UniProtKB/Swiss-Prot annotation:
Belongs to the UPF0391 family. The lineage of its organism: Bacteria, Pseudomonadati, Pseudomonadota, Alphaproteobacteria, Hyphomicrobiales. It is found in: Cell membrane. This is UPF0391 membrane protein RPE_2138. It comes from Rhodopseudomonas palustris (strain BisA53). One of its GO terms (cellular component) is plasma membrane.
Length: 57
């Protein structure tokens, strides 16, 4: 699951760079939404991993 979170985070960062750079002005809101979803998924994965006793995050 952490692999998916990292993948979505990278996609969100790329979309954010393109959107905020003026290349694709309409994608700014989509990039923000995807970025925050990726952050939430990362935090959920980290909490679940810590709750299960895994030391890797």
């Amino acid at each position: 699951m952490l692999g998916w979170v990292v993948t979505f985070l990278v996609v969100a960062l790329i979309a954010g760079i393109l959107g905020f750079g003026g290349i694709a002005g309409a994608s700014i809101e989509i990039a923000k939404i995807i970025f925050f979803i990726a952050v939430v998924l990362f935090l959920v994965s980290a909490v679940i991993g810590l709750a299960r006793g895994r030391t890797r995050v």
